Amino acid sequence: MHNTDTFTGPSFPLRNRLARLAWNLACAILFRPTPVFMHAWRAWLLRAFGARVGRHAHVYPGVRIWAPWNLEVGEEAGIADGVILYSQDRIMIGRRAVISQGAHLCTGTHDTSHPWHPLMTKPISVGEQSWVAA
């Protein structure tokens, strides 16, 4: 999935970095400037980049998503403006769960016991009908 030895090279392969570049361009042009009510459009765009988004999910335009292909959003879930989904690994948000403004879900950290501090990732799962607040 990724290089754990960041001393020998970047943590993620070129393909991943190019995909994130394409996502960031699409996000800047087609996702973030959309009106708040266009949840279906944003869900479609996320699906086009590999996310799994359930019916009637509300993903607001101010959400920042690192890698949509690592995102799964359940039916009727809500992700508010100002949320950061740092999805270096999988983020699964259950049905009818809410991620409130200012929440930051981060799947990555660094091994501070190693001299090169290599990247370490673990998935995050937010259960059904849960509420994550900042």
Task: Give the residues covered by each predicted segment.
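Flexible, glycine/small-residue-enriched loop-and-beta-strand segment within the central core
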Residues: 35-43, 63-74, 78-134
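Terminal amphipathic alpha-helical/low-complexity segments used for targeting or macromolecular assembly
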Residues: 1-56, 96, 129
